[in-house]
Amino acid sequence: MVTRDAGMADDAATGSTRTYQVRTYGCQMNVHDSERLAGLLEAAGYQRAADEADVGDADVVVFNTCAVRENADNRLYGNLSHLAPRKRNNPDMQIAVGGCLAQKDKHTVLSKAPWVDIVFGTHNLGSLPTLLDRARHNKVAQVEIVEALQHFPSSLPSARESDYAAWVSISVGCNNSCTFCIVPSLRGKEVDRSPADILAEVEALVADGVLEVTLLGQNVNAYGVSFADPALARNRGSFAELLRSCGSIDGLERVRFTSPHPAEFTYDVIEAMAQTPNVCPSLHMPLQSGSDRVLRAMRRSYRVERYLGIIGQVRAAMPHAAITTDLIVGFPGETEEDFAATLDVVRQVRFTAAFTFQYSKRPGTPAAELGGQLPKAVVQERYERLVELQEQICMEENRVLIGRIVELLVTTGEGRKDARTARRTGRARDGRLVHFALDTPWEAQVRPGDIITVMVTEAAPHHLIADAGILTHRRTRAGDAHAARQCPRSIGLGQIPLGMPSVGQHSASIGSAGCAR
């Protein structure tokens, strides 16, 4: 137990409103959870700190952490060390650590960073406001980790940042046992929401003006086998049925999902994707390795032949679908022959984009105990070869699109060079990032959330350029909301950038991708 100085101020006495920041590391599930954490804090009376504020400028800083890769640990504890002097100078400041790393390291976070005030896990997000109050009142650090899910995150308040796109969680947890992954032990076995609850959430989002939803789960193809409601019968076809049901929601223009698992990917899902107009022609299908021997060691319950068969079926049903993947380089025991097999599959499939990871040894996973851990220099050299090949393929595939007309959902915050290049940015239906030029008459009219069409004029490995002007422009309610700065913030609703993973990234940083399925 870590005690605090007795001089912690009571903001209720001063009348000031405490501000907060939520910093997110890892996968899209963490992004979804961070929306809920922000919503909980706002419902409790906290105010979001200015977007340009540095880490530590807020009264409360929450780190929502990832435990998948070693860099996540280093990044968290580096940031906590950075905050230590600020905490000493401002004892009223509170620091909370949650998420997968907190769930894993519940007994060590405070020993490594004793100035932390709150440690909470993946199953009790809703406890954060109470823990903050308790820590301030008792002047003692609060550690609360529970081992089973208390509430679906989607039942908690949400503070969404996007007027046009939202995450919708369909399940939590995972029933797989990949040897490299610690997530199932931290998030628990899969638990599925009822279709009625999911569709009600989607309909509420659309009523708020949202145009695109991403259905989110650790393994969406297993949806329907572990319903939380015991009255619902196990149904292997539930995910395909859910996609088709989303297709009947008036005003919902784009549906995405992530992530499926090749072992459980079935043809009824492919049919639903192809036959449901608002389901986007994009598929993120983790491969991890092109070697059957390595897949077996990873405990991935499929082999390359099955994977390629799925890709063939998808391309037959949706010839222009963008297919993205996850790849791990340097898994223990991986030989040059194994790695060459991965390169062969990459050449065959021609992924639109790939999240490429160097294997990271994680304590608590079976892979950490395997022999044949590879030298970093070998892993780095293979990684560079894989990235070079995928970059080449990305460029070739994107060049094919020059001259094509594409529909874009205009976004905000995705074009880092937009101001310098006098361009704006949108996402095509297949998930590709497109930077487009604004004609002077259009500049004030096009808002994030609006729909436009443009012609592709240039290509790069991770984006397209459309400098021939805007061909058509359709104003939307999402655009109206953005223009009015009235982002919907609702109980039980989800958020944020357009579908994951984003086409336009070839390698996964620890801050954007996290756990690979």
UniProtKB/Swiss-Prot annotation:
Task: List, for all copies, the residue spans of the domain called TRAM.
Answer: 399-470
Gene3D superfamilies per the UniProt record, alphabetical: Methylthiotransferase, N-terminal domain, tm_1862 like domain
Task: Tell where it localizes.
Answer: Cytoplasm
- Please list every transmembrane segment annotated in the UniProt record, as residue ranges: none
Q: What is its main location?
A: cytoplasm
MTTase N-terminal domain: which residues?
Answer: 18-137
- Record's GO cellular component, any one? cytosol
Any one Pfam family match given in the protein's UniProt record, by short name? Radical_SAM
Give the co-factor note. Binds 2 [4Fe-4S] clusters. One cluster is coordinated with 3 cysteines and an exchangeable S-adenosyl-L-methionine.
Alphabetical keyword list:
4Fe-4S, Cytoplasm, Iron, Iron-sulfur, Metal-binding, S-adenosyl-L-methionine, Transferase, tRNA processing
> Which cofactors does it use?
[4Fe-4S] cluster
The residues that hold [4Fe-4S] cluster 2 are C174, C178, C181
Q: Which reaction does this chain catalyze?
A: N(6)-dimethylallyladenosine(37) in tRNA + (sulfur carrier)-SH + AH2 + 2 S-adenosyl-L-methionine = 2-methylsulfanyl-N(6)-dimethylallyladenosine(37) in tRNA + (sulfur carrier)-H + 5'-deoxyadenosine + L-methionine + A + S-adenosyl-L-homocysteine + 2 H(+)
Molecular function (Gene Ontology), one example: 4 iron, 4 sulfur cluster binding
Keyword Cytoplasm listed: yes
Domain Radical SAM core, by residue range, is: 160-397
**Keyword check for Repeat:** no
E.C. designation(s): 2.8.4.3
Assembly: Monomer.
Function description: Catalyzes the methylthiolation of N6-(dimethylallyl)adenosine (i(6)A), leading to the formation of 2-methylthio-N6-(dimethylallyl)adenosine (ms(2)i(6)A) at position 37 in tRNAs that read codons beginning with uridine.
Which protein family is it in?
Belongs to the methylthiotransferase family. MiaB subfamily.
Its name, as the record gives it, is: tRNA-2-methylthio-N(6)-dimethylallyladenosine synthase
